[in-house]
Swiss-Prot record:
Entry keyword Ribosomal protein: yes
Protein name stated in the entry: Small ribosomal subunit protein bS16
Short name of any one Pfam family annotated for the protein: Ribosomal_S16
Source organism of the structure: Leuconostoc citreum (strain KM20)
UniProt cross-references to InterPro entries, sorted A to Z: Ribosomal_bS16, Ribosomal_bS16_CS, Ribosomal_bS16_dom_sf, SAP_dom_sf
GO biological process terms held by the UniProt record: translation
Similarity remark: Belongs to the bacterial ribosomal protein bS16 family.
PROSITE patterns per the UniProt record, alphabetical: RIBOSOMAL_S16
Keywords: Ribonucleoprotein, Ribosomal protein
Residue ranges that the Swiss-Prot or TrEMBL entry lists as coiled coil: none
Cellular component terms (Gene Ontology): cytoplasm; small ribosomal subunit
MF (Gene Ontology): structural constituent of ribosome
Amino acid sequence: MSVKIRLKRMGAKKRPFYRVVIADSRSPRDGRFIETVGTYNPIAQPAEIKLDEAKILTWLSNGAQPSDTARNLLSNAGILAKFAEVKAAKKSTAAKPAASATKPTEKNTVAEIKAYLDAQGTQYASSAKKADLLALV
């Protein structure tokens, strides 16, 4: 099921009012939706936008794709920037353990072995030889 963040039109004729909803991409524009996450009133001066940031970030992290207009609203509210930061932080923390997960061997340099031991929190003498450091691993 492909999930979208999009606008659902409400309001009277010539008086548009939109709800920002999470909906299955196959459902009609004003049809069934999963959850309401905000409102958008373009008639008000200035345009009135209310968004539930926590719910939107949750849905974005679960793979929901915003429509073009919803993307503009989220971008202007700063939610997409926060999502990009969260995603980058998650990616960088996931990459660090993978790099230090491999145990050093004889082929590694002393600096690489010391970096591994520092990441593990192991104490060692700064003047230790390579063989002594490998014994600590």
